[in-house]
A protein has these predicted regions:
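Hydrophobic/aromatic ligand-binding patch that stacks against planar heteroaromatic rings
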Residues: 10, 102-103
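Conserved nucleotide-sugar phosphate-binding/catalytic loop shared by glycosyltransferases and other
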Residues: 13-14, 18-71
Length: 137
């Protein structure tokens, strides 16, 4: 949220309408001007994947959240598409919302991801295999 706050303020100050889709909709009460923004409940994909003790990278997190389960993932993407149909965004900016980015891509809406090196990994090919860093003991 704090990552998007300055961007939101800049866009609003320059005449753009901004909407949020939040995992925890109660977060909206902490906004600088809470009545200035539309707020949607973000679709949340719960734990569905393999029982693992550690997620080493974002790909592991996606598996845990059900990204290998096509029908389940499709439901989450369709929920995002419903939000996009209602709001009609010109662009989608996501802070760790891979299903929203997938829905935006399918719908033809430009999207951007912001975040840290975990949710937006560096553009290196191949990515470092973090499983190799695990202590074998």
């Amino acid at each position: 949220m704090t990552t998007l706050a300055s961007l939101t303020r800049y866009l609003s100050d320059n005449g753009h309408q901004v909407a949020y889709a939040l995992r925890d909709i109660d977060t909206a009460k902490h906004f600088h001007h809470p009545n200035q923004y539309l707020v949607y409940q973000a679709p949340v994909l719960g734990i569905r994947g393999p029982n693992t003790t550690a997620a080493y990278d974002c790909a592991d997190m996606l598996l845990i959240r059900g990204y290998e389960d096509t029908p389940y993932l499709k439901l989450g993407v369709e929920k995002w598409q419903e939000i996009f149909t209602d709001y009609q965004p010109d662009v989608v900016v996501c802070d760790h919302a891979p299903s929203a980015r997938l829905a935006a891509y399918i719908t033809g809406i430009p999207s951007y991801a912001i975040g840290n090196g975990f949710s937006v990994p560096p553009l290196t090919i191949p990515l470092q295999n973090l499983h190799q860093l695990e202590n074998p003991d």
